[in-house]
């Protein structure tokens, strides 16, 4: 079976996380299925210099957010799972409560029901009780809550270094190794 990963980009700040995932997966020759929310399109335009077509060209397949009949909306379409990078609190809440009202949340619902890996790079601070409850619930459902917290021990030099390490770590949860996912070797004596 070809390795396939669904990449969801939702409307939280941090559109770059989704782009970096697509870049790293292209280098690994893993088939990517991209779905981008309307809020994510707004974040792309306000936070980055990326053109929409430039981002979409990184994916093997791009599915419109409203296409509930897309292949990734069915459990019979085999994937390694789904990475939502970044994941807004609205998307998290929709996944937890089973609202498959758009293709991003429907695909996440399918990944959970098929017992595949769902990794949510949640982006919000500070967190309120509803956020924390939803994170707990999605974890109980089998999802992985993965806030993209900078790994300062790696001594990042740029924002891209921080993004690359977080995304590489998230991809390692799918068994995908990238050059940015080097193992921690411990502290020097």
From Swiss-Prot:
Keywords: Flavoprotein, FMN, Prenyltransferase, Transferase. The keyword Coiled coil does not apply. It holds the Pfam family Flavoprotein. Belongs to the UbiX/PAD1 family. HAMAP family: ubiX_pad (MF_01984). Flavin prenyltransferase that catalyzes the synthesis of the prenylated FMN cofactor (prenyl-FMN) for 4-hydroxy-3-polyprenylbenzoic acid decarboxylase UbiD. The prenyltransferase is metal-independent and links a dimethylallyl moiety from dimethylallyl monophosphate (DMAP) to the flavin N5 and C6 atoms of FMN. This is Flavin prenyltransferase UbiX. It comes from Neisseria meningitidis serogroup A / serotype 4A (strain DSM 15465 / Z2491).
